[in-house]
From Swiss-Prot:
This is Ribonuclease 3 1. One of its GO terms (cellular component) is cytoplasm. InterPro entries: dsRBD_dom, RNase_III, RNase_III_dom, RNase_III_sf. Homodimer. The gene is rnc1. It is an enzyme of class 3 (hydrolase). It comes from Nostoc sp. (strain PCC 7120 / SAG 25.82 / UTEX 2576).
Length: 228
């Protein structure tokens, strides 16, 4: 059995594996895992941030933020959940199982967070015990996957945020060449919504500059705690 599933308190592990849908169908089971999920999410954000801070001393805040998002996004946490054997151990309601819950990335990732939170409590709130489990998982993610995920669709992600929070008006990118050479120009892009500037970025072509501006806009929103 994977070490993450070795608990002193079996009831705590059972609660971490129990989804709300199971409790709805079995009220006598008591508490579901959402409070533990909240705790695990906070722990994973801290440990991933600390791990990246130590392992990438040459990276700036924006890139570290993007890399952390890639390490603890739903897709990656779901993979971790399967790797440690959580998938068919999840306690789901019949409807969730019928809808493919054991393969559902959202359920897998949230259960993984809950088990991390529970493991922390089971080890007397010792963060070192969790670090010993989670850092090898972080290290197992190929660098190329982290890079690709951290840079994927930043313009689309920002546009989706605008549509959800402001309205249908798409972001506008103002791009100009600011220097470089004819064979290696340098461009600067500024992204606006209406008349408000949200971010800016520099790149070797217009596309890269606009992507950097969108990434900067997302980083600014994250600082203001405006991203989900």
């Amino acid at each position: 059995m994977y070490k993450l599933l070795m608990f002193r308190d079996d009831k705590l592990l059972r609660r971490a594996l129990t989804h709300r849908s199971y409790v709805n169908e079995n009220p006598e089971e008591g508490e579901h895992n959402e409070r533990l999920e909240f705790l695990g999410d906070a722990i994973l954000n801290f440990l991933s941030g600390e791990y990246l801070y130590r392992s990438h001393p040459d990276r700036g805040e924006d890139e570290l933020t993007r890399r952390r998002s890639a390490l603890v996004d739903e897709k990656q946490l779901a993979k971790f959940a399967i790797e440690v054997g959580l998938d068919f151990k999840m306690r789901l309601g019949k409807g969730a199982i019928r809808d493919g819950g054991y393969q559902n990335p959202n359920l897998l990732s949230s259960t993984f967070e809950a088990v991390i939170g529970a493991y922390y409590l089971d080890n007397n709130s010792n963060i070192e015990a969790v670090r010993a489990i989670i850092e090898p998982l972080f290290e197992s993610v190929p660098e190329q996957i982290v890079v690709v995920r951290s840079n994927v669709d930043s313009k689309n992600r920002f546009q989706e945020w605008v549509q959800r929070n402001i309205g249908p008006t798409p972001p506008k990118y103002l791009t100009e060449q600011i220097g470089g050479f004819s064979h290696a120009p340098e461009f600067k892009a500024t992204v606006l919504v209406g008349e408000k500037e949200y971010g800016e970025g520099i790149g070797k072509n217009k596309k890269d500059a606009e992507k950097a501006a969108a990434e900067n806009a997302l980083a600014n929103l994250n600082k203001q705690e405006l991203l989900p």
